[in-house]
Amino acid sequence: MWKYSNKIIYRNVSGNQLWFNRNSSVGGTLSQQTQLELADSRIDEKWQQARSFGEIPGPSLLRMLSFFMPGGALRNTNLIQMNRLMREMYGDIYCIPGMMGKPNAVFTYNPDDFEMTYRNEGVWPIRIGLESLNYYRKIHRPDVFKGVGGLASDQGQEWADIRNKVNPVLMKVQNVRQNLPQLDQISKEFIDKLETQRNPETHTLTTDFHNQLKMWAFESISFVALNTRMGLLSDNPDPNADRLAKHMRDFFNYSFQFDVQPSIWTFYKTAGFKKFLKTYDNITDITSNYIETAMRGFGKNDDGKTKCVLEQLLEHNKKVAVTMVMDMLMAGIDTTSSACLTILYHLARNPSKQEKLRRELLRILPTTKDSLTDQNTKNMPYLRACIKEGLRITSITPGNFRITPKDLVLSGYQVPRGTGVLMGVLELSNDDKYFAQSSEFIPERWLKSDLAPDIQACPAARTRNPFVYLPFGFGPRTCIGKRIAELEIETLLVRLLRSYKVSWLPETPIEYESTIILSPCGDIRFKLEPVGDLM
């Protein structure tokens, strides 16, 4: 269960303790950490005037459980639907009681609460999520991970030590953009493969487009992480890569089952949890083999090649390097492919916006044989606006989560330290209060200036509050893969929409299923009509 004192915060998970010691330091000095007083709170006048924690609206434990029973209000809903229904029932702030060892969780849809939470998260933000992953790495397989849980599951100084090592490699723009030539080549190969699978008469694909996107994403992230080509876009793909993609689908489903939904696995290892451990064993074995193979090739005939993430991190710490690259291979498939598919869907449903974007792309690439460079990709304002707008309407995560390290007042209620806070960003991104005509795909709302007579900036159509739109999170725990994902998405969309006019074929909107992310599912079919070169 969760415990909190004035010295430590931890959760005991079958002998595994996540420590947040006030006497430790992170990315700075002890005095800096002490000044923030992660485990202390100041009882001020605002706190004394606030309503009590017990007055926050919300269901009882039994009521909450009934929602997921057959016939319950939240039965068979995805995370988008669940947030919307609960907000309709309880308003812009409500509390879900803790269960199965998890803390109470306050859900808020107030951007002022978002800012309050982020501004008080300290230098060691506490984001509990993948506890099953932490158990696997630190308790089940310490032989492989040597005490390193990774950025997704470690907390406190352990998390900070890892983050400080990987930030210069993964968050520095120029360090990431040096991968552009190869990522462009991978995207061109993806287009070539689509062409072999496209019916020339109906312009439809004969294969699963979403699965093909996953193969592109895997090929891209494996190059960035390992400087390795898997051959997934060729006629002879690596069979282990296909196996890994399948195991990753299972992993995302299991993580949702054991880390998001109520589960007894922390008290009793169920048959389903043992299947999860086996799935993760398979993932670990495959990724370990890829890493070992890549390491054997380092230093041989480099000829000035760009160092991949693994090679750069090995210069600092082998344990961190291996774990970080495993995380990249795991997280870089479904997340990036789902985001790409979502943005493409919105552009396919809005042909006039797509045509405006294509004019920009034709300027960048007059012919499909031209290459993407740092120079010609500097000025792509409409593409980047389209990406922002697509992720505004449908972010692959509905919100951001933190454990409060100090007492806070949110929406006029006392929220004691140690409470979980879920900030429902996606709900606000689809609220007319913050985005005019929020259900409409309007990239122009993100432009700073007019681009053409028919592409005029309308920043008034979006809120000026910076805490409403946060697809990659905020603060020290901003998504570590943000720079890589942005580059991959931009490169793929440039190539795809420069080559084809894309239309959405199903009569119904795209559907999403909940794993630990929102993933497109159901009937996913596009029409791809070739676009010629400029004469």
UniProtKB/Swiss-Prot annotation:
Known cofactor(s): heme
What terms describe the molecular function in GO for this protein? heme binding; iron ion binding; monooxygenase activity; oxidoreductase activity, acting on paired donors, with incorporation or reduction of molecular oxygen
Enzyme class name: oxidoreductase
Q: Does the keyword Disulfide bond apply?
A: no
- Provide the protein's localization: Mitochondrion membrane
- Name the GO cellular-component terms: mitochondrial membrane
Per its UniProt record, what InterPro entries does this chain match?
A: CYP11_CYP27_families (IPR050479), Cyt_P450 (IPR001128), Cyt_P450_CS (IPR017972), Cyt_P450_E_grp-I (IPR002401), Cyt_P450_sf (IPR036396)
- Please indicate which superkingdom the organism of origin belongs to: Eukaryota
Enzyme Commission number(s): 1.14.-.-
Question: Which keywords accompany this UniProt record?
Answer: Heme, Iron, Membrane, Metal-binding, Mitochondrion, Monooxygenase, Oxidoreductase, Transit peptide
Task: Kindly give the PANTHER family that the UniProt entry links to this protein.
Answer: CYTOCHROME P450 (PTHR24279:SF120)
**What is stated as this protein's family in its record?**
Belongs to the cytochrome P450 family.
Q: What is this protein called?
A: Probable cytochrome P450 12b2, mitochondrial
Source organism of the structure: Drosophila melanogaster
The record lists the lineage as: Eukaryota, Metazoa, Ecdysozoa, Arthropoda, Hexapoda
